[in-house]
UniProtKB/Swiss-Prot annotation:
Species, as recorded: Bacillus subtilis (strain 168)
Superkingdom to which the source organism belongs: Bacteria
Protein family (similarity comment): Belongs to the Mu gp47/PBSX XkdT family.
Gene symbol of the encoding locus: xkdT
Protein name: Phage-like element PBSX protein XkdT
Amino acid sequence: MFEDQTFEAIMERMLNSISADIDTREGSVIYNALAPAAAELAKSYIWLDTVLELVFSDTAQGEFLDRRAAEAGIERTAATKAVRAGEFTSGVTIPVGSRFYVDNLYFQYTADGTLICETPGEAGNANLTGRNLLSLDTIPGLETAIVKEILIPGREEEGDDSLRERYFTRVRREAVSANKMHYKEWAEEVDGVGKAKIFPLWNGEGTVKIVVTNANLEPASPILIQKVKDYIDPEPGQGEGQAPIGAVVTVESAVWKEVEISAEVLPEINHSIDEVKSEIEEGVLNFFKKMAFEDNVIRLSQINNIVYNSPSVSDYSNIQINGTSENLVLSDVEIPKLGQVKIIEQTR
């Protein structure tokens, strides 16, 4: 808005207001006296532009976006801690609160028999399955302690884009009166949930089915499914949670659909077929994350585009999805999982 308020423009206006019989050339007393003020005014206009960016929700960032969201009763979701299963010596009672260590991470044993990472965020999602845990407490009879699979993934603090999207959903009243968007909002408020899909009247009048992924956009664990159920409808139809009286909610996990990709590729000079495969795998994985519960068709053209834009690819042909040169349609509850990627090197 104030892009034209430059140092030069401000100086020109100031000098034009000086009497014509006074020397205003660069280096003159008047010029040198006005120049510092003009420079500060130019900086002020730059700050005014910044302030305008920060006070409107579509461009606000950080704490300024937090303050706008708070006006609508929305808070930025804090980082959450990963919850994992553990395996311990049979017959040994592990006291609640016992601490364990592995790979620079500390875990606490909880009342429900799980391990919660003390470090918030995605750190606890690391590939630790099968690793031995070091007990930091003396526990009689404990000989083995092993960290197992992730039950509820940890996630980082909510980013600006996600918070802004939730803010707009609220102020535009897209999620109100227990409509589909409202159920989606409730489900995605639960720590550990990534995305939710809503199926109204799926089993008759008053029934709602919610299908969820975890924060990593993978199938949800039974513990996470129960958390969503307890938050929205702990006592079916009684209105004890977020859902209104009479609504009976069923919560289920999304289901993997394994997707295999094959292609014939000519690598760029000085690039190996392994580099090509790695780039294609990364591109497809990112694409699958974005499309989960947003689109249920994996289009051949989209895979073609990923291969075409891979830096190590010179040329390609015969791309297939699950053995066919056709689009792959997912069911309403399926999310794609990348299976085998078969890349055949073309000869020059």
